[in-house]
A protein has these predicted regions:
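Domain-level signal for soluble alpha/beta catalytic cores
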Residues: 1-140
């Protein structure tokens, strides 16, 4: 019987914390993507070596809106999102795995941007247009 079970990688935050990385900031694990990309690649490789079939990009807490608030221009924002893909690709190549590992974009909910814990209850104090525009900006 063929095994159709596929494994998604695990948390970015836990391995970062184990490595001593301070996640107490607005970008959470995205801070490591910007300031310590080699550590992100190392974590991806660890998940590949553990059997992951899918790697999530390290962009859950990163959004166009948060980066704009930090004064980052559109070109740099695109570079940050591209870097998350490139690191996952490099981890796959460097691991020399024979598996066909897929990369999945990790895009956090609108509520994670709001910083009010509403992602845990799903009650957003926002309009549909605000939520729509938030996600469109991230996808562009």
């Amino acid at each position: 019987m063929e095994n159709n079970i596929k494994l998604l990688d695990g948390s970015m935050s836990y391995p970062l914390e184990l490595d001593g990385y301070n996640l107490n900031n607005r970008l959470w694990t995205g801070d490591a993507l910007i300031n310590n990309p080699e550590l992100i690649k190392k974590i991806h490789k660890g998940y590949i070596n553990s059997g992951a079939d899918y790697l999530l990009t390290s962009t859950y807490q990163i959004s166009y809106d948060i980066l704009r608030e930090k004064g980052i221009n559109l070109e740099k924002i695109k570079e940050v999102f591209q870097k998350s893909l490139d690191l996952a690709k490099k981890a796959i190549i460097e691991s020399k795995t024979k598996k066909d590992i897929k990369i999945v974009a990790s895009l956090g909910p609108f509520a994670s941007y709001k910083k009010n814990a509403s992602e845990y209850v799903g009650i957003y104090d926002s309009t549909d247009d605000e939520i729509y525009n938030f996600h469109c900006n991230n996808l562009n």
